Amino acid sequence: WNIVFLDGDWYYIDPTWGDASYQREEGEETPTLTETVNYDYFCVTTQEIERTHSMDDNQLLPVCSAVQDQYYRHEGLYLQSADKEKIDEIFARAAQKGAPMVCFQCADDTVYQEVYRLLIEEQGIFAYLPESETTAAYLDSDRERTFYFWFTEVS
């Protein structure tokens, strides 16, 4: 991973953990490019990176504590609460852009669990499906408190 100085603050970026762009389909010799990029490790704090990465004790590194350029916050994809209006806004912006995927991060475990209950357990995600015949798939990470949703038209 890397440490970068951005807009006057230090951040961690791990592009290798976020690169889901190359996948091999069975029988393919070359990887294919997908449209999914994982932003969980883009401009994160020391506290966030230490949940999944181990640092060498012999390296003197700056403390990364700024959050304003963390991907989800910077892009308005960060939920401070399980606010239905904010969730509606995130899905509406993605639909307006024609994005095949919606992703966002929750501020803490309580918000993550409440959003999980609303969208997954209570099946609230289906309210965001387009009117055409569409299926939804999702990936969530309780460790990173993130959700990724994909919508695919049924052929």
Region roles according to the model:
Residues 1-43:
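Hydrophobic/aromatic-rich core segments of domains that either
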